[in-house]
Amino acid sequence: MNILAFGEIMMRLSVPDYKFLTQTNELNYIITGTGLNILSGLKNFGYNTYMLTKLPNNNVGKASSANIRKLGVKDDFITYGGNHIGLFSQNGYGERPSEVTYLNRLNSSFCESKLQDYDIDKCLEEMDIVHICGIAMQLTDSVKEIALELARKSYEKGIKVFFDFNFRQSLNPERTYDDLVNDYKKILPYCHGLFASYRDINKILNIDSLNIKSSSELIKKEYDIGIVAGTMRRFDDMNNRFIKGYISNDDGYFESREYKLEIYDRVGAGDGYVAGIIYSYLENMKSEDIVEFGVASSVLAHTTYGDNSLVSTGHVLRLMNNEKIDILR
């Protein structure tokens, strides 16, 4: 099974020991990005994974591609040009929320890439699944054009497209949420799988009164989507955090059991859910097991340092089966 993801590769800068940036002279970095995080998870689940993106033609780009290969993700379709990679810093602890600070992201090699930089037909020759990150629709007009063309050609070739909304208002302040909704409506007819929140779906459908079950079933019918999936989070009075997943497909609507979260590093946990849903869907699991596998994958991603999903199917299945093991020997 071959899976391609289109999206931006980022460099995440982290301050050690949860300090403020003003308190340190040191930074750690991780090569990350929604597509890469999902692919690393699917690679660990046993699939062949390929990244479609553009990196700077310098040592930063070389280091990034080396990190991509280290995760087992193939870089055959990565192109090079320009001299800048998108940067962001993000750290928080306890009641102090993490803050994401983007550094000149819209001028990165990826954001300045053009359709002619990619041989899309060649990239799709042996692909079974394509994932397109919704952030690609929020950046520059040229990147949006690439995402739409990739979705269209994949659809025409019978390759299933999975798409997530992943809205980030701070990425491009000049574009409103309504602008983005109109662009999402252009790509949805090509999509087989959709990852979305209750808010996202209601905005697309221009409704505000339905629950997630009704909303997901409506958007599935409206755009002839095979599977709609997402997570639901809540807090209790003690500030404990909980998560569960949902899917809506041809078999009906299903929710997972709820997990109390132990959070080591939340960034990338949603990508862990996407990887889990795609894997269990491709493995033809029962609908009840698809959503349980997906949310278990996300729960484990909360316990992993860094954005990239690194857990195995064994890890996920043990959690699904409620096997409490402190040490694997």
Could you describe each region identified by the protein language model?
Residues M1-F20:
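Positively charged, low-complexity intrinsically disordered leader regions
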Residues F20-L39:
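Short catalytic helix/loop segments, enriched in acidic residues and glycine
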Residues G33-N44, A147-K153:
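Histidine-anchored nucleotide/phosphate-binding helix
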Residues N48-G134, V316-R329:
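Conserved N-terminal subdomain of the carbohydrate kinase-like
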Residues I146-K157, N182-Y190:
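Catalytic-core regions built around general acid/base machinery
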Residues S154-K160, Y223-G226:
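A short helix->loop->beta-strand "cap" motif at the edges of active sites that frequently abuts
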Residues R168-D250:
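Conserved phosphate/ATP/ADP-binding segment of small-molecule kinases
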Residues M238, Y253-E323, I327-R329:
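Conserved post-catalytic alpha-helical subdomain immediately downstream of the catalytic base
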